[in-house]
Each structure stands twice: as C-alpha cells, then as structure tokens.
Amino acid sequence: MSASLVGSEMCIRDSYTSDKISMGFRRLSIIDLDAGSQPIYNEDKSLVLMFNGEIYNYKDLRKELMEAGHKFYTQTDSEVLIHAFEEWGEDMLMKLRGMFGFAIHNTKDGSLFIARDFFGIKPMHYAMVDGSFVYASEIKSILEYPKYKKKFNHKALDNYLSFQYVVPPETFFEGIYCLLPGHYLWYRDGKVTTTRYFEATFK
C-alpha cells in the first residue's frame, strides 16, 4: 500500500509490523535527517508513531515535556508528538500548531489513535474492510488493500451533482471515508469512533 505513495527523491519509506498491525509510510525528511526515521517510539516502546506533516511549535513543547521528565533521543518534531500524547493524551491536540496527520498505536491494548490538523491541510482516509481497519493519507493506498473491493459511492454522486463537491466524510468510493479537519479517531476493540476536537470561533 505504501508503495502507491510516490513522492520526491527526498521521500523515505518507513514501516512497522507486529502480529496485530502493519503501518507503512512515505515521508519528506527535513528535520534531523539521520535520526528522524520512523516509526518513533516512547521510552518503553508501548507507543508507536507514524507522522506526516510539521509541528511549528515543537521546540517549545519539547522543552515543556523535558521539564516533565520525558527523555528525547532525536531533535525531531515527530518524537515530540509521541511524548505529548503520552503526557496529555487527546488534549495534546489543542497544544499543537502546524499541519499534520498521524497515527499512534498502543502496543499494550491494541488501540489506534489517528488525528488530523485543525484545517485539514494534511489528508487522512480510513475504511473498515472485512473486519480490518485500514487507513492512509491518500485513497489510492486503500484501493491497493487486497480485500477492498472497489465500489462506486452513489451517495457521493448525489452530493457532487447538487453541490459540485463531495460532502465529507463521504468519498467517491463506498466504505472509504475522510477524517474531517479538526477531528481525531479511535480504533478500539473493532470499533471506530471519531470526535471533533477543534471548532473555529470568531469574535
């Protein structure tokens, strides 16, 4: 699936596999090129992160987390993310400034946490396929999943003919959804739940 994500010459292919989950990624490495290989782990390797994007305020967050006792082994913004999740859980999202789509797997309870930035600059899609949860930044990667049977989503066509736009979370492919901007997703015990964490306010 990750092979379908073709990027520039600077893109690096990363992967993680266990008996419960497989995670693949292609990323543009621009910070701490040698140490920034993914996946990124927390101290006891109970959390595994795959991350696409950039956290603008990662240095400030890193300092705060170090003061809280977290140990860092790289200068990357991705390592800041995993320690932030370990420290603050879902609440860490409101501390972030940047563009991002990331997934964190808990190796102890088997759960998967996925989040997308406030404004949806970085894409994220997901599907339940024959009892398995599949996610990717681009739909074409999910289409490569062997058990997914490509099927047109007529509901999306109705939206498009009415608005010239597919109303999210629907996509043109049946069973494939986009994670909305400013939302996070939990996959636990075979169930998917999505929650809005950010809503713009105007004063």
Predicted features along the sequence, with ranges:
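Positively charged, low-complexity/disordered segments
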Residues: 1-9
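Cysteine-centered catalytic environments shared across enzyme families
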Residues: 8-9, 13-203
